[in-house]
Swiss-Prot record:
Classification via InterPro entries: DUF4633
Disordered as annotated region, ranges: 1-74
Originating species: Homo sapiens (Human)
Name of the protein described by the UniProt record: Uncharacterized protein C11orf86
Gene that this polypeptide is encoded by: C11orf86
């Protein structure tokens, strides 16, 4: 195991913009909220299903509140939040880099430095 994921990601860009989770593992807040609500919904339907004798996907489909977002819509919104985060981060890094480069007006990166 010579090269880790960290060094590899510096060499080639990884297509992680559309993913719900950032590469270093900080989950989006919407994803946490969704996981929590799913867990609560499953527990609720499981307890009600035992009383009624129906357990499984039928119980959760009947309890779905009209007007609430479906799975696909939630995924799309989470992706939009993630891509907005990446755009803000990119712009922030670019501004910092430009201000850093402005300190050295005579240095050009296109020519190799002579020894």
């Amino acid at each position: 195991m010579g090269t880790g994921l960290r060094s590899q990601s510096l060499r080639e860009p990884r297509p992680s913009y559309g993913k719900l989770q950032e590469p270093w593992g900080r989950p989006q807040e919407g994803q946490l909220r969704r996981a929590l609500s799913l867990r609560q919904g499953q527990e609720k339907s499981r307890s009600q299903g035992l009383e009624r004798g129906t357990e499984g996907p039928d119980a959760t489909a009947q309890e779905r509140v009209p007007g609430s977002l479906g799975d696909t819509e939630q995924l799309i919104q989470a992706q939009r939040r993630g891509s907005r985060w990446w755009l803000r981060r990119y712009q922030q890094v670019r501004r910092r880099w430009e201000s850093f480069v402005a300190i050295f007006p005579s240095v050009t990166l296109s020519q190799p430095a002579s020894p």
